[in-house]
């Protein structure tokens, strides 16, 4: 019914990479599903040098309020690469869905193309570095609408804003049910015994995910409870910093036989699924966060989760009901120890978490929200403001 209202329209998604990171993962699941409803949805990526993506990584960190040294040369490189993509990238959608800051400057084409333009911001810009935000705001102001993942992420804008939380696909390789044999085979592959509780964090190798802090929290837990840590992550083609973070994490872990640092290539979803299902507790100790869908992935598997109270995580973790929210290294360690000491409580949290995800963070709800957004932009004359 909703999809029929978009008959004949082309929706063009543009971001900075086909693989690695939450945006690419969401698009890879969402676009085929929308297509099955008869809506013409396509996906393109911008091109950029390693130097360009170093600049956009600085922007990303600065928008998350991390201190970064950003120079006039950085802004000039961003403008130069943006102009090159404006000149070379074919833009043809009736609705152009631009994801995050990297391709934001493509809005310059609106003057000659017209059409409807949406800026989909997947990150928290509520307390941005003001210099970077002052640079990006003139681009944002030209869009027809902006979409944020959580109410706390947004800021005052001269355009319409919409709230659409991201989602997981329960039938994807990362979330579907797995046989015990499959789970065991992954543990054997990576040399992870099941002789003690397994504490796991799944995330990109990114300073904002605080992998070194995860190791520190684990060491505090291990003083009281014998357990092992698995940190499985990937790198992304638009994140040049990730290899540097990986090296630091490996150095911090040293030769501790109870710490397993795994580099999992993008698309290795069944193994990630298996690692989550084999875990006793899932951790997401982010310093800053977009939405943090690894939390919903874990909750869907009925796993007890300890996660930082940042970004979109508090929308997924209702403290002491669907998981435990934590603050800092000691707080994370305390929450993990609490769950290890109370397995029935941990199990109860996991069951509540699955129900919460079922009703709020599955792809079917996400799909409906996007269709309603597209229809709104395409039929604005029918909207009545009360």
Name every feature range the model reports, one short phrase each.
Residues 304-307, 317:
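Short hydrophobic beta-strand element within catalytic cores of glycosyltransferases
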Residues 12, 187-209, 215, 229-230:
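Conserved donor-binding/catalytic core segment of Leloir-type glycosyltransferases
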Residues 287:
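Aromatic "clamp/platform" in nucleotide-sugar-dependent glycosyltransferases that forms part
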Residues 280, 302, 309:
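A short alpha->beta transition loop at the rim of the catalytic pocket in nucleotide-sugar-dependent
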Residues 233, 237, 241-274:
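Nucleotide-activated donor-binding/catalytic signature segment of Leloir-type glycosyltransferases, i.e.
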Residues 273, 296-300, 314-315, 321:
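Short alpha-helical segment that forms part of, or immediately flanks, the ligand-binding pocket
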Residues 338, 345-360, 366, 372-376:
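A short, well-ordered alpha-helix in the C-terminal region of glycosyltransferases
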Residues 319-330, 338-343:
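Conserved acidic donor-binding segment of nucleotide-sugar-dependent glycosyltransferases
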């Amino acid at each position: 019914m909703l999809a029929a209202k978009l008959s004949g329209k082309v929706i063009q998604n543009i971001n900075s990479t086909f693989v690695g990171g939450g945006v690419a993962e969401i698009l890879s699941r969402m676009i085929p599903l929308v297509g099955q409803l008869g809506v013409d949805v396509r996906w393109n990526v911008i091109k950029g040098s390693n130097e360009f993506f170093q600049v956009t990584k600085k922007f990303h960190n600065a928008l998350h309020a991390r201190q970064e040294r950003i120079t006039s040369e950085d802004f000039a490189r961003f403008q130069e690469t943006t102009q090159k993509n404006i000149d070379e990238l074919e833009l043809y959608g009736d609705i152009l869905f631009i994801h995050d800051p990297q391709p934001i400057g493509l809005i310059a084409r609106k003057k000659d193309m017209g059409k409807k333009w949406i800026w989909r911001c997947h990150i928290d810009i509520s307390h941005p570095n003001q210099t970077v935000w002052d640079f990006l705001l003139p681009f944002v102001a030209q869009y027809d609408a902006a979409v944020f993942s959580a109410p706390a992420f947004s800021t005052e804008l001269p355009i319409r804003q919409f709230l659409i939380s991201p989602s997981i696909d329960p039938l994807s390789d990362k979330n579907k049910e797995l046989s015990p044999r499959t789970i065991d085979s992954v543990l054997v592959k990576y040399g992870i015994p099941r002789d003690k509780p397994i504490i796991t964090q799944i995330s990109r190798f990114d300073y904002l995910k605080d992998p070194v802090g995860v190791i520190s929290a684990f060491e505090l837990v291990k003083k009281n409870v014998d357990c092992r840590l698995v940190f499985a992550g990937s790198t992304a083609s638009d994140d040049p910093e990730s290899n540097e973070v990986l090296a630091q994490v490996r150095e911090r872990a040293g030769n501790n036989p109870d710490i397993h640092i795994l580099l999992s290539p993008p698309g290795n979803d069944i193994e990630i699924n298996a690692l989550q299902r084999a875990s006793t507790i899932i951790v997401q100790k982010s310093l800053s966060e977009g939405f943090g869908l690894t939390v919903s992935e874990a909750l869907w598997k009925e796993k007890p989760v300890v996660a930082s109270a940042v970004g979109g995580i508090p929308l997924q973790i209702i403290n002491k009901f669907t998981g435990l929210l934590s603050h800092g290294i000691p707080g994370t360690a305390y929450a993990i120890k609490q769950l290890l000491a109370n397995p029935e409580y941990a199990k109860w949290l996991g069951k509540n978490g699955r129900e919460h995800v079922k009703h709020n963070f599955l792809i079917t709800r996400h799909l409906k929200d996007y269709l309603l957004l597209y229809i709104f932009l395409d039929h604005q004359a029918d909207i009545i403001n009360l």
